[in-house]
Amino acid sequence: MDKVMAQLESLVAHYEELQEMMADPEVINDTKRYMEISKEEADLREVVQKYKKYKENKKEIEDNKEIISNETDSDLIEMAKEENAELEKEIPELEDQIKILMLPKDPNDDKDIIMEIRGAAGGDEASLFAGDLLRMYEKYAERQNWNVSMIDSEPTEVGGYKRVAIMITGDKVYSKLKYENGAHRVQRIPVTESQGRVHTSTATVAVMPEYEQVDIDIDPKDIRVDVYRSSGAGGQHINKTSSAVRMTHLPTGIVVAMQDQRSQQQNREKAMQILKSRVYDYYESQNQAQYDAKRKNAVGTGDRSERIRTYNYPQNRVTDHRIGLTLNKLDRVMNGELDEIIDALILYNQTKQLEELADNA
């Protein structure tokens, strides 16, 4: 904790500098700079407040010890002892909170995301489940005051999706939804099942951070561009011109289709932006996979082949296999109430990081 305390002192000094800069007329008149400083100040605020509270508690404890040692009034001594009992109970809690706030931040946590959901094993039932997951994430996004926009979709005749890609924008989207990467398994009785048997199907979810300006050069020769007509559910044509765009990055096989914009040019620009994000993420993930392989206490790669969660409809139960969490409220989870699961995953990840820091200390 001593190392952390030394870091915190310089952090507080930097925080106070930022506050002074925010009051500087020159900074106030420079909107971009002001926003950057304001964001940094907001990011540091919680840890600075916790540290100040920690220092206040420590000082009050020492002051009370003075009273206990030197005071003759028994009532004052008893009051100081009671106060110290409460303050000392808060100290380890504050230390844990500070340690978590001081953990290295994922540089992508503030980013918006591109989410792709695919029906996997299970045919029509898998495509229906992909649609259910889409609605679950849309409802969760609504609860978080995030915005969801459709990028591309392949609807099925039964009302599900073979594949659907969406963009979710808002505050710290990636920090919460990055844990959704992987295979999601559903156990339920399909509508078409006459014998009442429970079937098992899967859908995969891929979550990628959306990079505003990706520093990656893609050779135009490595991209194949196809244009086609935009279509709605069931294959109905939205327009009669070839405005939809499909881009394939040949070296990686990454495909991006875009039909949500009004013109082919807009679809091309958006598709290229997303393609760059995905190619960048692909190479970043390779580096991350090599790093994770060396980590003794890896939380999990988030690989799509992993079965991360099971949704059991007959028993109204959802289980996250990575952390052994089971909730008997599947109906509420499918209605977008994901906070309990996501908060538990964040806490698990933070605990693992703290263990690693302790091992390396």
UniProtKB/Swiss-Prot annotation:
Keywords associated with the record: Cytoplasm, Methylation, Protein biosynthesis
Matches recorded under Pfam families: PCRF, RF-1
Keyword Protein biosynthesis: yes
Localization, UniProt: Cytoplasm
PTM text: Methylated by PrmC. Methylation increases the termination efficiency of RF1.
Primary site of residence: cytoplasm
Modification type N5-methylglutamine: residues: Q236
Domain of life the protein comes from: Bacteria
Keyword Protein biosynthesis applies: yes
InterPro entries, per database record: PCRF, Pep_chain_release_fac_I, Pep_chain_release_fac_I_sf, Prokaryotic/Mito_RF, RF-1
GO cellular component, as recorded: cytoplasm
GO MF terms, alphabetically ordered: translation release factor activity, codon specific
Listed Gene3D superfamilies: 3.30.160.20, 3.30.70.1660, 6.10.140.1950
HAMAP family in the record: Rel_fac_1
Task of the protein: Peptide chain release factor 1 directs the termination of translation in response to the peptide chain termination codons UAG and UAA.
Family assignment from sequence similarity: Belongs to the prokaryotic/mitochondrial release factor family.
Stated name of the protein: Peptide chain release factor 1
UniProt lineage: Bacteria, Bacillati, Bacillota, Bacilli, Lactobacillales
Underlying gene: prfA
